Amino acid sequence: MVFFDLGDTLWHFPAMPPVEVVRGETMKRVSALVRSWGYEVDGERAYLARDIRFAIEEETSRAFHGDCIDPGYPDICRRVAARHGLDLTPEQGMALWEAWNLGGAFLGRRLYPDVLDTLRWLRGRGYRLGAITNRGYSGPRFHEEMRDLGLAELFEVTVISCDVGYMKPHPRIFQYALEAMDVEAAESVMVGDSLRADVEGAKTVGMLAVWRRPSAADPVEATEDQPEQAGPVQPDYVIGTIGELRSLPLFIASGPAG
């Protein structure tokens, strides 16, 4: 069984719009939603999208470097909205969170060139595939994008932190994935770009770990992990691209372990 991280492992954002365009679009969508609920959007309330971003960045960092419990992003949106005088229901909090997420299509998400061929090669050798990802949004638009990218048909399971309540490297998210696929950790491999989230997390539960080493062209999600590269947990294998999996003895010497 081979599990993959998603961001900066299988896909990246080479065509991301300028930051001012992204933030402007977020503000537009959030403001339109708030107006649809009958609220005025003026004064400080016009900066609701910005304040949600600040809170998300703070809470995500706290969780990732702390207890790895998912922060509950719709609730974060409700709390920030309350500071702007908006009394939102849980359903409205979820709608606000969905509006704040622009989606991979808008942000220019693309698979790395060798991803689909490599995943199909692994499937052809009898390996079962899945994904384990730290992600605050798992709504219908995300799963539609997974289908559009060609990943949904290749993965038997996609385990998302906001759905299970735990972020990598917490053992529970890995255990959830193993239980969902009815496989043992010793039979499984984790491939990802984060030494802490993917390598440390996988090895803690007894999985093999392949580190997809971030390149200079992929700085977005790698920056956070740079201090961890000298840590005590080391990957079993290191690759520069997903295509290099096809040359690892792990995958060419034999078929799946179980």
What is each stretch, according to the model?
Residues E25-E40, P71-D87, G150:
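Helix-loop "lid/cap" segments that line or gate small-molecule binding pockets
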Residues D67-D75, P90-Q92, A99-G130:
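Short, acidic loop-to-helix structural element flanking the phosphoryl-transfer center
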Residues G7, F13-A63:
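Conserved phosphoryl-transfer catalytic core
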Residues M1-V2, H12, A32-E44, L116, ...:
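Asp-based, Mg2+/Mn2+-dependent phosphohydrolase catalytic module
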Residues P14-G24, H65-I69, G139, P219-A222:
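Short, flexible/disordered intra-domain loops and linkers
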Residues V34-D51, R83-L96, E153-F155:
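Short, surface-exposed acidic
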Residues R50-I56, I76-R78, L96-G103:
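Short, Lys/Arg-enriched alpha-helical recognition elements, typified by the DNA-recognition helix
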Residues A15-M16, S61-A63, L102-A105, Y127-R128, ...:
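A short, structure-level motif marking secondary-structure boundaries and short turns
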